[in-house]
């Protein structure tokens, strides 16, 4: 133990001396080198702390592999939007490989290094940081949280599968059990991939296999005595993972001016890269997809990018998103329901979705809107003067003026208008997801341009705004969808199975008072399988112009291209 402490002290001293001599620090000079295959969590923890203390501007890694285990990693408690309920995962502790804590003007230059994680970990967190760049890095897990099984053959006695070499399993009491480094999969979600069609879809295949007698026929091969009526498609692959979002891929928390550039993110456990109440986030050439040569199909247990309560500008440029079990991009705020008046100018507000609660949703000085849940109309505004946390689910907020008389308790909501971003998503590629491609709800300017959406199971672009389900705010006012290509999207579901869906949660639909406004869909190319190109509800000033629509072979006949409900003054022009 004494030797370990001396080594740690030496590392800190070396790092501090080097950092004071130059703005650039080389990890190798501090004894951190690739391909040792030892646990570097503690060394990186101490090195980053030393960089902060010394004011180091650039940390440089040699190219190669660096390994991180939970032991020695930083542990922090955070409530993170859209992760786990109190019942699913009472602990909010995250185990962090690289923690940037209150750092400013700092760059990690990876030179193509691969950071390999073990167990269940949050790979990177930036907590209350400014002006941070992560560049030229790859992130992966030795044993990803997702397992992959490919149907090899079937006969009258059952089915044989091949498990991917990164998937760990054991036959226990005649049944298959999936496990990893310090964990096992119990509550399973299964998505199936068909390589012939390129489609990714919900499947009951795992439930059948897990309940069937199993025998290992060779390393990595298992035979199941499945029911006679089970007829899987040979060559398809099941991707299965635990539903509990107890960690995230990365967490950017109340930080500003963060750049992720030239990254390969090859697996994320739980949720993906979550930016929460942060400002000015840019991702440029970030590839969220399986590592080249890995032979894997899955790269995230859920979303790839999740932006909750962010502001400034969110920019996603030249990225690739391949192999998510949920939405590649989701940008939204959080509506809190008004549950009690505590004074003339104060309310108790409650988080309404079990998986989104406990985080700071309002700050003094923020402008808010009061929202009618039935119509999703913003009907009054105020400024926050103070916030008091009453519990993990309830906060008391005091405003600079009386609460509007028309507010209905236990029904209407409060939306934070300050914590809403402009959004630019450009030159990106989306495929191999069973859900949507991009979800966005913000009142500020949105540009979605020059992207390719290929075979998203549900709507390629979904604009909701709700006070009923996830309580993800709110009405959009300026959206341009231009020069994108949509290939066989929404073949499996979504609102009206439409490629682009504008679907607010309002139950009161009045064309004279639309929820969404000024959505322009211009110059795009659609290749569809007979499903609608556009579904729009309660949208004013909708423009659909100069788009090309092609029908794919084997398309379903007789479907409408457009489905409109309660829209005001739409302009629909087709070629």
Segments from the language model and where they lie:
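Ser/Thr/Gly-rich low-complexity blocks that favor extended beta-strand/coil architectures
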Residues: 117, 141-143, 152, 164-215, ...
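The right-handed parallel beta-helix/beta-solenoid scaffold, focusing on the short coil/turn
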Residues: 23, 57, 96, 104-106, ...
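Acidic Gly/Asp/Thr-rich repetitive segments characteristic of extracellular carbohydrate-active
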Residues: 27-60
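Extracellular beta-strand-rich solenoid/capping regions of secreted or surface-exposed proteins
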Residues: 45-49, 67-107, 116-135, 143-160, ...
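Small/polar beta-strand repeat architecture
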Residues: 200-245, 378-381, 387-423, 431
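Bacterial Sec-dependent N-terminal signal peptides
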Residues: 1-22
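Short glycine/acidic-rich loop motifs that flank beta-strands on beta-rich extracellular proteins
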Residues: 56, 117-123, 143-148, 247-249, ...
